[in-house]
Amino acid sequence: MTDSRPVVTRFAPSPTGYLHIGGARTALFNWLFARGRNGKFLLRIEDTDRTRSTPEATEAILQGLRWLGLDWDGEPVSQFAGRERHAEVAHAMLENGTAYKCFSTTEEIEAFREQAKAEGRSTLFLSPWRDADPAGLPDAPYAIRLKAPRDGETVVRDAVQGDVTFGNAQLDDMVLLRSDGTPTYMLAVVVDDHDMGVTHVIRGDDHLTNAARQIQIYQAMGWDIPVFAHIPLIHGTDGKKLSKRHGAVGLHEYAAMGYPAAAMRNYLARLGWSHGDDELFDDAQAKAWFDLDGIGKAPARLDFKKLEHVSGWHIARMDDVELLDEIADFRAATGAEPLSERQVARLRPALGALKTKAKTLPALLEQAHFALIDRPVQIEEKAAAALDIVSRSILKELTAAVQNASWGRDELEAAAKQIGESHGLGLGKVAAPLRAALAGRSSTPSVFDMMLALGRDETLARMQDQAG
């Protein structure tokens, strides 16, 4: 492969369920690498397992990618749909002498391996049909096997792992086409990547051994070998391979926990890749900075505290439109009702104050409770203690004092302080009944932030409801 070829990457998930967090990171790395080089990011659905590959599972993958904000070029490619092309290549390898027909049965192969095991030999199958005379082949079902080199080495020149060498004696003559005519995964992947023009294969390092075998197919067909980059897997906080015992493993779970997509892109990009000491960045920076040299060899560890920090940074810097879109996506992910126009109208002016303190969308919405409720405000038991007779009287005075105020923060705060001083009370004592009246809770954002967000009419109405 020459450096002049436009960059083409691909994400090739098997649609057997939701999009795993590891798969999401692999997709992100491919997307960033392509987008940062004006290349193409392609999507292939490896749906050859017809029992597990369902339309619903495929849609779950697509939904996960859409939520994460990863757009792909062209239509998704179905691997199953290319099975005739895969078979065509297997037969082309028969013609050029790099593959052969193998008539060995499953029972014969198993017997070979059992005997080899008993004798302490390698159990790699050595087909007796590898060098058989074509004129003497039986008229029977056969598989097509790669005539892999027996001597020497196959080197995977990996952009992350470095050169990884495999002795050819340890790589068997893999099956390319089964006796029922169906292609194997190894063949299908190589043919699809070649036909799609893929220049860089960025995937998990659990595929590293596969790369050596796939290189042999590329060489047999005389095709350009793509750049391989095998990235380390994601581990849990205990250093073990990520699993459900560590918490959320599906991307949809993170969406339901209220982490914005922008924060997930930032966090996942840093999970195994680095650009100096930069921890927080936007998409434009990630696309410009991302390269394969920055990917480490060691497994990355999931860190929820770091994720919350990243999430808080992204929430704080979002504009109102973007943040409201994220909130809508979050509520959809959790099955909650969409916010009404009235709720959005009250929430929008509150976002500036709320977003600087929230680490997640649920935390923001919890603080935004006052903007999402309607009159009459339900008063929680703890907040009700701040609405005794004296406090209601003070609230009534404050209501009258701010009735005709210019409704700016300084004016509202000055009025509250003046009422407090007239009763020998601090601002906190005046704010407590006001807080209860506006939100029905004892823990809320600043009372003046709430008053500004709710506006004059709604604020006065809530105050009057409790002032008596």
UniProtKB/Swiss-Prot annotation:
Keyword field contains Ion transport: no
Chain residues that bind ATP: 244
Domain of life per record: Bacteria
Root EC class: ligase
Motif, 'KMSKS' region: chain positions: 241-245
GO BP terms in the entry: glutamyl-tRNA aminoacylation
Motif 'HIGH' region: where in chain: 13-23
GO molecular function: ATP binding; glutamate-tRNA ligase activity; tRNA binding; zinc ion binding
Pfam families hit by this protein: Anticodon_2 (PF19269), tRNA-synt_1c (PF00749)
Primary location: cytoplasm
Catalyzed reactions per annotation: tRNA(Glu) + L-glutamate + ATP = L-glutamyl-tRNA(Glu) + AMP + diphosphate
Keywords: Aminoacyl-tRNA synthetase, ATP-binding, Cytoplasm, Ligase, Nucleotide-binding, Protein biosynthesis
EC annotation from Swiss-Prot or TrEMBL: 6.1.1.17
Cellular compartments per GO CC: cytosol
Function: Catalyzes the attachment of glutamate to tRNA(Glu) in a two-step reaction: glutamate is first activated by ATP to form Glu-AMP and then transferred to the acceptor end of tRNA(Glu).
Subunit structure: Monomer.
Annotated family: Belongs to the class-I aminoacyl-tRNA synthetase family. Glutamate--tRNA ligase type 1 subfamily.
Protein name as it appears in the record: Glutamate--tRNA ligase 2
Annotated organism of origin: Paracoccus denitrificans (strain Pd 1222)
